[in-house]
């Protein structure tokens, strides 16, 4: 059976849409009529996906990490209960409240019922199920332990979401503070300063240097503020476009890695992802070289990716994993020692997991320390700027009071 998306009218003339399974479009139309619906459009999901791909869509946005973790966890639980895979996919699709996810799962189930493996069926949605996900599912299907593999994938997605949530929560306060500070300074320069200082200019009073500087800044902001904002947005767009060029992105990422604080954070994030992903791959009986290739895909820094791919080539030529990674000079000594211990004891999976946990904790600690320093410094800078504006605005008034008191 195939999956079809339909648009129909009910007895009251209201539009309805959804996903239904059937052998062909005619059968689906008949089933809709039996439900007192007038079919307006019935399209097989695979045909619709092909149309969408030609137009540049078809799940290119993917789905959120929490949604992926949820459907993976639900599927793992149902597979563990002994239900046939087709019924598990149907149940998860019916439980989903989001039409996009429901449509995707029904289409995946349709391919599974046609005889395709689950990993092949998921391959139609590469922006939702990445290579790590599909490779592990394929390994689970071959080994007969699909349920445990899905559980590990759900844990992996949930851990990534937790780390992302912690980082986002830590960044909320500084970002709000920056926006608030910029807003206050812009308001003072654009609205308050011209009205107060302008009175002294009209009186012909000589202004202190700080006040004159403030007035010039206010005039510049009023005349060129919008152009400056547009230019800034264009610059951001240009930088993002340039970073899509592989050679420029590689040089940029190499520079990022060499920075004092940001570089340490970037190394910690990428090495932790590598260790955790490789741990999951080895636990799913994926060969070490294939696991390294999959782990590289989840890393975000192109320079780190390049170095790890070179390390994978060294492993292929017979080097140990520890020595190959040590040559990159990107992995912390503790992680390298734990990997060496895992190779010698045959417990590489467990040691990689512990190394990833340690690196995650170190990453979180580094971020907290950096934000702990940055936030007070930002508050002090904001207070200094506001104080400068207030004092520069009040200085002509104080000078006038001194002249009048003499």
Swiss-Prot record:
GO biological process, one term: protein secretion by the type II secretion system
Example of a GO cellular component annotation carried by this entry: plasma membrane
Segments passing through the bilayer: 172-192, 224-244, 369-389
Subcellular location: Cell inner membrane
Main location: membrane
Highest taxon of source: Bacteria
UniProt subunit comment: Type II secretion system is composed of four main components: the outer membrane complex, the inner membrane complex, the cytoplasmic secretion ATPase and the periplasm-spanning pseudopilus. Homodimer. Interacts with EpsE/GspE and EpsL/GspL components.
Functional description taken from the UniProt entry: Component of the type II secretion system inner membrane complex required for the energy-dependent secretion of extracellular factors such as proteases and toxins from the periplasm.
Entry protein name: Type II secretion system protein F
Gene name, Swiss-Prot/TrEMBL: epsF
């Amino acid at each position: 059976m195939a999956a079809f998306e339909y648009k129909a009218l009910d007895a009251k003339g209201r539009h309805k849409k959804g996903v239904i399974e059937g052998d062909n479009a005619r059968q689906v139309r008949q089933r809709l009529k039996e439900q007192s619906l007038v079919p307006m459009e019935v399209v097989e999901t695979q045909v619709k996906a092909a149309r969408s791909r030609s137009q540049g869509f078809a799940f290119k946005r993917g789905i959120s990490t929490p949604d992926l973790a949820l459907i993976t966890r639900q599927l793992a639980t149902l597979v563990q209960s002994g239900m046939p895979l087709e019924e598990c996919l149907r149940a998860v699709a019916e439980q989903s409240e989001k039409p996009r996810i429901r449509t995707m799962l029904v289409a995946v189930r349709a391919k599974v019922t046609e005889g395709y493996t689950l990993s092949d069926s998921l391959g139609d949605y590469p922006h939702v199920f990445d290579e790590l996900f599909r490779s592990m599912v394929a390994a689970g299907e071959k080994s007969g332990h699909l349920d445990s593999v899905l559980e590990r994938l759900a844990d992996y997605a949930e851990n990534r979401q937790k780390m992302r949530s912690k980082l986002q929560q830590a960044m909320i306060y500084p970002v709000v503070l920056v926006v608030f500070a910029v807003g206050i300074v812009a308001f003072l320069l654009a609205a308050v300063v011209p009205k107060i200082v302008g009175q002294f200019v009209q009186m012909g009073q000589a202004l202190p240097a700080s006040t004159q500087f403030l007035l010039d800044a206010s005039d510049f902001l009023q005349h060129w503020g919008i152009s400056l904002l547009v230019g800034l947005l264009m610059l951001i767009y240009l930088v993002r476009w340039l970073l899509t060029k592989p050679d420029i992105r590689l040089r940029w990422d190499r520079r990022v890695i060499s920075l004092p604080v940001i570089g340490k954070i970037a190394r910690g994030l990428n090495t932790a992802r590598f260790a955790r992903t490789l741990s999951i791959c080895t636990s799913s009986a994926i060969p070490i070289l294939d696991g390294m290739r999959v782990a590289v895909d989840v890393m975000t820094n192109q320079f780190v990716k390049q170095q790890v791919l070179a390390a994978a080539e060294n492993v292929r030529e017979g080097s140990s994993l520890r020595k190959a990674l040590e040559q990159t000079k990107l992995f912390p000594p503790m992680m390298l020692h734990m990997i060496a211990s895992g190779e010698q004891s045959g417990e590489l999976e467990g040691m990689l997991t512990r190394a990833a946990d340690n690196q995650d904790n170190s990453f979180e600690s580094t971020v907290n320390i950096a934000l702990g320093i940055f936030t007070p410094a930002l508050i002090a800078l904001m207070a200094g700027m506001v104080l400068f504006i207030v004092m520069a605005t009040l200085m002509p008034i104080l000078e006038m009071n001194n002249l009048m008191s003499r």
